[in-house]
Amino acid sequence: MSRKPEPQLQAMPLDRSILWNPSMPGVEKSEGTSRSPYPIFFQQEAVIALQEHVKASPTQAIFGFLVGDLFRDPDSGVLYSIIDKTLKLSQTIYGDKTEVVVGRLWDRMQEQLAKAHGTLLGWYHSHPGQGGLLTAHDIETTQKFFTDPWHVTMLVAAEAGGVTGKFFRLSPNDDWHKTPLPFYELLQPESIKADGKKRSFITWRNYKAYGPSLKGPKPKPPEPEPEPPAPPPPPPPPPPKAKEK
């Protein structure tokens, strides 16, 4: 377990995010008020980097680290994490002994982490052809290296319909490795249009957005009521009476 970094004070950016819930039977859906520790915010820049890494090696296992910062909401006191970058392993991984790979790369990763001025928030991995659940090696890797409450394990895959992903977190629950977590997609400023529409980069078929991911246009302001008609002009004065002779 690593030393807990001091969280930065910052309001939870719910208004700039889209909440994604696992679309699996039996998984409780969050409404954005989850009391679970360290809600996950996945910044769109990191989403793009991760998906490009997966698409570049769709049939080979990939590996990388998730980097960002920890924050505390000053009003609610909730601790949360924002993943804003990835440290990808460029070499190809053969087999699935991720514990060995992480152990070999740990010191190099710490050096890159110091250069990035970030906090290690977790790791991601793919194992094509082995299903959408964590393997025994993935579980061992998490239990040995990623035991802090803000750490996450992410399983990704390139499928015919695009990239899919799942977040997991070590917990006392025996089924933690079978229980994907909800997360927030933290939007870039240009992904929020002037009319309130939100553009998502998440195409994962195994997650669904809570509520509409696109907001409709703002309602039109009420049309001004027509001005009352002008009063009719006053009647003309009667003609003067003729003088009697």
For each feature predicted by the language model, list its residue ranges:
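Intrinsically disordered, low-complexity proline-rich regions
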Residues: 218-239
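Membrane-anchoring helices that localize proteins to membranes
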Residues: 240-245
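Conserved beta-strand-loop surface patch within small alpha/beta domains used
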Residues: 1-120, 129-224
